Amino acid sequence: MASLNLGFSGARKKAAARIRAVERRNLITVCRFSVKTLIDRSCFETIDDTSAEFINFVSILEHILSHRLKGQVSWFGYESPRSFWDFIRMACSKVPHSCIHSIENMENVRSSRAKGRAWIRVALMEKRLSEYISAALRDFKTTRRFYEEGALLLGEEAGLLADTLIGLNAIDFSFCLKGEGLDEDCPVVIDYTPYLKFTQTSDSISSDEEEMRTLGSSGSEAGTPESHMAASLMADQSSWFSKSKRLEQKYRVVLEQRGYLEELVRLREAQLSESVSQNKALLQRLTDTEISHKLEKEQLEIIILELQDQLTVLKNHDLRSRQELTSHLTNQWPSPGALDGNAVALDTLLYRKRTGPWEEKSFPSLEQLSADMSLSQTSLDPVQLNTHSLDSKAGLAHWHREGKEDTPSLRGLCGSLTSMASYKSLASLKSSEYLASPTTDMTSPGLTPS
């Protein structure tokens, strides 16, 4: 039983799919007929709101745009009918220079149905109806959101619809958008009468001609020659009339196809020229970008070279500064010879102070001087510096015990020989007027040691 129900449901689904396919084919076929009728009518008169062909075309287009359109779900879960304007407003909002915003702001058009009808008229006057439909079909996500499965805009017939509407760009429409008649709630009805005309085929025409000839031949046996001639003339006239009708019909079809193809070619040429211009602009932009990148790369390479040169200069400068600092510190430290001379002068002075005041032409012996020199050399030894400092302090204490008066020139001798202040005080001792250098006295030509 379950399998039987599944079979019935599958059959119902297939039947519903076939019905939807038939609906789509019928709608697209009627739309093509309506477009051709509008093109034919536009050759003789201006198309406006009162034209029967235009009213029928608008009804067909509303049926196509409303085919299997989803309803709007309310807060309570009920589904209310929706107008196709909601879909057009969402799907065509990104079309450049669109009329969507101006229709939204129209004061005399308030309902969604009226705005949708106003949009159709404005798009026809702008000759952009096919462009709007194509843009809406490209937004497949929005189309799927607004239409159910099996809708014409979701099928293969949607592309045929956009191509069919291109032919309307050759017509100059003129409408009044005052809102009168746009808010009618009556259901739109498609009039199929103009498309149900009887068209005689070529086979039926030939059979009619054969029948006329047969009737003429049968009547000629019992009739006069005049009646036979009249029958033949009527047959010829009917044949020529039927031929002219066929030629006129073919001419109209070819003319319509030519207009359609010319409009299609113009549209494709416009699209091609636009694509070519966009391609040129992109190529120019790419060239400019490559040039700017190349210039930027060259500038960065120059900056890198300059930074490398500056880094080399800074390294060399740092090396020279280190060398200069090392030589400067080396030069500031006194040489061993200068230290020996200063030590000799200091030891000689201390020896003279211990033995008594200097007398003119009174000098120590050479043995004493050599002993003093050896003493001064040993005083520079870091191990014996402390001992020498203690001897100096003892000598100074001996001067105080003898009641000697301290002079400013002798106060610099109280420190240790290891400090820089003591070395500087030795230089001041040489220029003092109270102390004389023993080396100068010894090398004077007028004095001899006793």
From Swiss-Prot:
The keyword Coiled coil applies. Residues 203-225 are annotated as: Disordered. Pfam families: RUN. The keyword Nuclease does not apply. InterPro entries: Run_dom, Run_dom_sf, RUN_RUNDC3B, RUNDC3A_B. SMART domains: RUN. Transmembrane segments: none annotated. It comes from the Eukaryota. Residues 291-317 form a coiled coil. Residues 48-180 form the RUN domain. Keywords: Coiled coil. Belongs to the RUNDC3 family. This is RUN domain-containing protein 3B. It comes from Danio rerio (Zebrafish). The gene is rundc3b.
